[in-house]
Amino acid sequence: MNDTVLKPNLIIRHYKNLHNYASLFQEMRSYTDQRDEHSPDQLWILQHHPVLTQGQAGKPEHILIPSDLPVVQSDRGGQVTWHGPGQMVIYFMFDLNRLKWNVRTLVSFAEQLMIDLIKKYNIDAYAKADAPGVYVAERKIGSLGFKIRRGRSYHGLALNIDCDLSGFQTINPCGYAGLEMVRICDLVENYPRFDQLAQDVTAYFKEKSDFNDVQVILQ
């Protein structure tokens, strides 16, 4: 049998407007629960309205300063983080069994995606074995957290572009006290905006051999 036939199709949804975290959280869960072995994998690229999200390992004491930011309990891995405008969020709804990936493969893929994306703009980033995410000179530029149900993933990564870092100052980001965050705009003068990076992500997946057909939907 031709190997191409066995590869899944991928739908990339590029959301233009800001989206509510809680609503998309429920949509991700619903898609994961209802999909079957024939369902295409999906990748959602978007920005959220400002929000704090607690992962499964999150602790209340990691929220340092009361604020008017909503706090949403999530079922992803990891601890507390901030999402908001100027931060690119990518959600991976992948059938890991079909891709023949394990959790480590998914995490490494997401980290390498961020590293490769910003390397194009002369930013040298790296991952750490003991602290998931992507770093530049010990400052964190990209975070990630996943949930796996019946071999299928949802949630994903967040890459800081030109977001307001004050949201991170109300928390211990990812549970690490004093962890300094950094943005692409801090490192590159003529930095790529959200739409450009979303196009870069689409090109990245079209070049990958893991998927048969890549369809892009603008929303």
UniProtKB/Swiss-Prot annotation:
Organism: Acinetobacter baylyi (strain ATCC 33305 / BD413 / ADP1)
PANTHER family linked to this entry: LIPOYLTRANSFERASE 2, MITOCHONDRIAL-RELATED, OCTANOYLTRANSFERASE
The protein's name: Octanoyltransferase
Signal peptide (UniProt feature, chain positions): none
Gene Ontology molecular function: lipoyl(octanoyl) transferase activity
Catalytic activity from the UniProt record: octanoyl-[ACP] + L-lysyl-[protein] = N(6)-octanoyl-L-lysyl-[protein] + holo-[ACP] + H(+)
Enzyme kind, highest EC tier: transferase
Coiled-coil stretches noted in the UniProt entry, renumbered to this chain: none
Annotated substrate binding sites: 76-83, 143-145, 156-158
Domain of life: Bacteria
